[in-house]
Amino acid sequence: MKINRVGNYKTGFKYYKNKVEITNNDEIEKIKLLKIPPAYDNVTIINSKKVIAYGYDSKNRKQVLYNPNFIAKQNIIKYKKISNSIKFFSKLKKKIANDLSNTDEKIKAIAVIITLIFTCGFRIGNKKYEKENNSVGLTTLKYKHLKFENNKILIDFIGKKGVRNLAYCDNKKINEYLNNKHKIASSNDDYIFSYGANKIITSNDVNEYLKMICNNTIITTKDLRTWNANMLFISYFKKLRISDNTNIEKDIKKAIEMVAKKLHNSYSICKKSYIDPDIIANIAKYK
């Protein structure tokens, strides 16, 4: 049964079921326990196994509040898929290393994008996000987001949720690629990752590239960030243990902080949505 929330956080809320106001205090308290953001407008409460409610933010963008149990199950599936795909990622790294020298413009551009996901922690991005949120990702990166400094390139843009993404790229092949593209660009507002007659690389193009390498499991650009987060976490943790082998909890926390910074995320989002809890649990056992 759908319930509609009317009002705002300043004047208070009323709840309606079939256009009849809910006045039972117990029912109202149950709704409040769902913790639906007060800033959302036109809220519809579903409270199903998948979705608790949806509403619209200040920019009239639809926002969905998912059931925590659904998210937990999806995370289990996500981490299992990642842990079962070690051969895929090994194969992918070899392919993109080769494709950075590919003469096909499209394939080479995709290889550069995937390399930057791994080395700089950037999101893939898309034109819809750019238009609606004024946020940039790799497929919507423009020359104005690059700063050439000696043998390195600084990539600087505003990404998802208004977070500034800032990272240096010191990969020689990628720097050569970006330098050459920049020299022939007609404007700093041009998209970098284009091919042919100004065709722009999209997230779908990158996912199709990944699909060619996959066997049965479909790996997407989102999975690349998850895999990268866990590999970075393990690497950072090992380095921290060399200098401090007394406090595992402290090193786990610090390693997650380092991953969050690399991925341009908050600590809580990184821990909740990117790092496999089984990896953390297994590490924590060896005190």
Go through the PLM ranges and name each one.
Residues 273-287:
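Catalytic-site neighborhood detector that most strongly recognizes the C-terminal catalytic loop/helix
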Residues 1-136, 144-227, 231-252, 256-263, ...:
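A positively charged, amphipathic N-terminal helix/segment that binds anionic biomolecules
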Residues 266-267, 277:
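The DNA-contacting recognition helix of HTH DNA-binding domains
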